[in-house]
Amino acid sequence: MFEIELKNSDEMVIRAKDNNVSINVVQSTINADLKVGMIRGAGEFEIGDIAIIAKSLKGGGVMYRIDVEGIKIGIVGSTAVIEDLDELGPIDILGCSDAKYVPVVEPKIVIPMVNMDFAEIKASVKNEKKLKIKNANSLPAVMEIWNLD
């Protein structure tokens, strides 16, 4: 089981068994309270049981693919172009700043970030403080929007 919440509109926090990882989509940083400090930019990282692939975007910035307990999480900021999204692969949960990414990625859960206008997305909306994921079987069959505030 793990939890996802937003620290603010541009920073997602993932709380797994033994690790907490905070990813800021605007600043392109990963913070996991590591001795080396904050991680900036692209690369592949394993922080305990959380695997992260950070890919540079053509328009600047970084997008993230995070694997936690077999569930794939994508985090995409406003500098991504549609062609960039192919590099994410299949995604279960998408945190993004633009609704145009949603039909391309087709996640089971969308988490609006950076004040994304999600009114045009046809899906049920849940307003909660955090999202708790037990396992892959607990993901919804039909896409949902989780507005974490």
Feature locations, PLM:
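Core dinuclear metal-dependent hydrolase active-site scaffold
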Residues: 1-89, 93, 128-149
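Proline-aspartate-enriched helix->loop->beta-strand connector
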Residues: 90-117
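Short amphipathic alpha-helical segments and helix-helix/interface helices
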Residues: 63, 85-88, 99-103, 122
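Short, aromatic/basic amphipathic alpha-helical patches
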Residues: 118-129
